[in-house]
Amino acid sequence: MSNSASSFADVSSGCTAGTPVPADSPIRDNIADAVRRVRETTPLAQSFTNFVTINLVANAQLAAGGTAAMSFLPDDVIETAKIAGANYINVGTLLPFYKDALPEIAQRLNYLDKPWVLDPVAAGIGHTRTAILQTFKAAPPTMIRANASEVIALANMWGLNTETVGDASEHRPAGVESVDDVESATGAAVALAQYLTEQHAKHSSHDASTRCAVAVSGIADLVTDGETVYRLPGGSAMMTKITGAGCSLGGVAATYLAVSDPLTAALSASLLYNRAAEIADTTSHGPGSFQVAFLDALWNVTAEQVAESEILVQ
């Protein structure tokens, strides 16, 4: 392991407290199964993502073993959603027509009972983005993948976060970067996961006992289904030096959502990314070679390596 990888791992583990998930836990079996199923079945996950990172999103989905489709017009998205296993919406770069298109797409996905992942990039910045994200409360996703500031901002926006100290305007992303640590987003993440689960239980034809999930990326990732909070130490600081690491994680989470329940999908995608980043860090020499090595690691890392990663219950 390189110096940067080892130092990041030390910081990641050091800032996280919790009880380790046992090696024989069914959670680990579910994660390994999800990784294998994606590689065996190559599920289609459709993405409505931003222009800056669209290439990495597609390549990461392919490297994880899935199939990618990038769509933007509502009729294209809805028709593709009928054959896709899951869908992904990322609001990182906006065009004027998105203000009408994205709410329509979200409503149709929910009407068709199609699972989808939301990445509320830069939540809290700009009236158009805020208006779009507010409409998703009435047509919520199955999973949310975001950084800590975005999770806090979205929970405040939806009137769900009662644990944030101070005015909601204080908790805003700096562009697409988080200004809050993962720990501070715990209450918001739990509240969002509970809300998503409640709404899908009312309107979905799927098993009402299935819980939705929220994944918060950071030094030690957090994943919750609204009942249990998991922390996932690991990864590499180099992930912050390539554009689209978080966006592509959302796309891969959608790939896993096509073959598994939301919690398993969120855990599997986050752990896959952490393990692949650690492997890539040992052979790369900078951001360019790291991105190439990272995609190779997504392709080569085994289901067992992913499932054996450190998982803590908070």
Swiss-Prot record:
Its EC number is 2.7.1.50. One of its GO terms (biological process) is thiamine diphosphate biosynthetic process. It catalyses: 5-(2-hydroxyethyl)-4-methylthiazole + ATP = 4-methyl-5-(2-phosphooxyethyl)-thiazole + ADP + H(+). The keyword Isomerase does not apply. Its cofactor is Mg(2+). ATP binds at R145, S217. It holds the Pfam family HK. Residues 1-13 have a biased composition (Low complexity). GO terms for molecular function: ATP binding; hydroxyethylthiazole kinase activity; magnesium ion binding. Keywords: ATP-binding, Kinase, Magnesium, Metal-binding, Nucleotide-binding, Thiamine biosynthesis, Transferase. InterPro entries: Hyethyz_kinase, Ribokinase-like. Pathway: Cofactor biosynthesis; thiamine diphosphate biosynthesis; 4-methyl-5-(2-phosphoethyl)-thiazole from 5-(2-hydroxyethyl)-4-methylthiazole: step 1/1. Substrate binds at M70, G244. CDD domains: THZ_kinase. Residues 1-24 are annotated as: Disordered. Belongs to the Thz kinase family. Catalyzes the phosphorylation of the hydroxyl group of 4-methyl-5-beta-hydroxyethylthiazole (THZ). This is Hydroxyethylthiazole kinase. It comes from Bifidobacterium longum subsp. infantis (strain ATCC 15697 / DSM 20088 / JCM 1222 / NCTC 11817 / S12).
